Amino acid sequence: PDAKLYVVTGDSTDWNLAQKGDSLAGKTLRLNDDGTIPKDNPFVGKEGYRPEIWTIGHRNPQGLAWQPGTALMFQTEHGPSGFEGRGGGADEVNIVERGKNYGWPTIYGKTTAPGLETPLLEYSPACAPASGAFYNGDKFPVFKGNFFLGCLRGAKIIRVVLDGRKVISQENMLEGNVGRVREIAEGPDGFIYFSTSNRDGRGSSAADDDRIMRIVPEPPKK
């Protein structure tokens, strides 16, 4: 909404980098559309920090979406994997705000510490939210303003009903019906589109995978 380019980066399998200001790993970055650095970025001129950085302390961020009406930035993020020795699960949805620290690896999931941000939503066991999108169309009035997560490991779409920053309810959709869901988006026609990711070596693929699919309302009953 501010006409800037936002980029998310993982921690490059070295979790210490997420807290290091001189590394771009494990961060949200903010740039102008020509690649230059906005002068109002939070770490511009701060010793030991790269000026591109918007937020720090991320493990493996995935999708970004801005909430209609508030312009809050929502971010989906994958929690720790077994090889890191910190268990599984703890996937997150965060509200990402200027200059804040989202904790990895000091905190993750439901753990807390002073000065570090806890997630709006946490998922254990893991559902691997690969994308997120707000619905603002007119084909599904009941979905207006809802946040949708495409989940890989969970093989489903999660619908989150929100009131600003407050979570009202959640609903699992298409669970187990289409396999791993990679990307989800609202089309210009007002329908919801999503892509599957069953041929990435981690899913069971059908003969016609992978696919881009569309969700449409049920026709009215006669």
Predicted segments with their positions:
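Beta-propeller domain segments
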Residues: 2-4, 11-171, 179, 189, ...
